């Protein structure tokens, strides 16, 4: 038997084995996910989850890990949705919404990255953030009530969005090829949730361009992961930063989001491009929407978390 023929047979055999292995893995992963018990079955039910780990990411940012009921459990949160955390501080019930940075590929726990707003730091908010300071002081083993899924947007993959204009409205389906993302501060978490879903699916050709605004360079949350995704998946993510105060060697933009930043670094308006925004209300109302209007982005193809 000629050597060339033997080589061809060997190559074909190797490809077949790899193909079967990939098929088996995908089937196993799908079956595992189907069999995994889901925590968030009823959106109105509260589930008490214990804190099992806290990582310090920066001077004011923490990653909190809460345990699910068993090591097999998944949270069961659709892409685009968030959870509500409820705590009682004195006589006051405090509720805040967060998007986890973990996903349903993670079993047994849920991770939240949260910026802590300390007392006596911002002159307009001398008391700081009630929920974030409560979580900062939470001890390992103590519990917080989770509720969800919640939210008006769900990403179904391959550029398909299901969005409710108002909370009680029926969802409207959108099919797009590109996503313009405008995020400020902790508003990056729902964007990262969506970006992760897109890059995880090799068949999802949806492209995202992200403009991420912060006060200073050290305030940029999850920067290492964002930079890594942009470097390794340039066909799926275009990334740009802007900060209020910059150093001499800062290679990105400085200042509030403006029309030039959007025009130079994000996808232009088109019928197959949707705009997603998440950040402080002044950013959305005074920096994002007026400049999107100026550049001709369709208001019907915009969504603010």
Identify the function of each model-found stretch.
Residues 2-21, 163, 207-305:
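Reductase modules of NAD(P)H-dependent flavoproteins
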Residues 19-39:
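Transmembrane-helix exit/juxtamembrane "anchor" motif
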Residues 35-147, 214-216, 244-245:
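Ferredoxin-reductase
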Residues 97-108, 156-182, 291:
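Short, compositionally biased
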Residues 100, 188-202:
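Histidine-anchored nucleotide/phosphate-binding helix
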Residues 141, 145-159, 167:
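Aromatic-rich membrane-interfacial microdomains
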Residues 176, 200-208:
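Conserved S-adenosyl-L-methionine
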Residues 185-190, 280-283:
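Gly/Ser/Thr-rich loops at beta-strand to alpha-helix junctions
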């Amino acid at each position: 038997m000629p050597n060339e023929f033997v080589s061809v047979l060997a190559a074909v055999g190797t490809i077949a084995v790899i193909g079967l292995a990939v098929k088996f893995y995908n089937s196993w992963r799908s079956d595992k996910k189907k069999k995994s018990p889901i925590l968030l079955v009823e959106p109105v039910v509260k589930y008490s989850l214990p804190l099992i780990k806290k990582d310090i990411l920066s001077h004011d940012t923490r990653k909190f890990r809460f345990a699910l009921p068993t090591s097999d459990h998944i949270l069961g949160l659709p892409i685009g949705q968030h959870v509500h955390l409820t705590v009682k501080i004195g006589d006051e019930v405090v509720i805040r919404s967060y998007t986890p940075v973990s996903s349903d590929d993670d079993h047994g726990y849920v991770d939240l990255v949260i910026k802590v707003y300390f007392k006596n730091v911002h002159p307009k908010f001398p008391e700081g953030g009630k929920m974030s300071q409560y979580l900062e002081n939470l001890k390992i083993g103590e519990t917080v009530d989770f509720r969800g899924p919640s939210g008006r947007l769900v990403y179904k993959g391959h550029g398909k969005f299901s969005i409710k204009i108002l909370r009680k409205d029926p969802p409207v389906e959108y099919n797009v090829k590109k996503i313009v993302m405008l995020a400020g501060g902790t508003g990056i978490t729902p964007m990262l949730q969506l970006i992760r879903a897109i890059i995880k699916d090799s068949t999802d050709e949806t492209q995202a361009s992200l403009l991420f605004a912060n006060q200073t360079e050290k305030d940029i949350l999850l920067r290492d992961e964002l930079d890594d995704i942009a470097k390794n998946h340039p066909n799926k993510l275009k990334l740009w930063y802007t900060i209020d105060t910059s150093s001499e060697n800062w290679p990105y933009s400085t200042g509030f989001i403006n029309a030039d930043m959007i025009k130079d670094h994000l996808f232009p308006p088109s019928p197959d491009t949707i705009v997603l925004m998440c950040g402080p209300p002044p950013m959305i109302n005074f920096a994002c929407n007026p400049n999107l209007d100026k550049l001709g982005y369709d208001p019907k193809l915009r969504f603010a978390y």
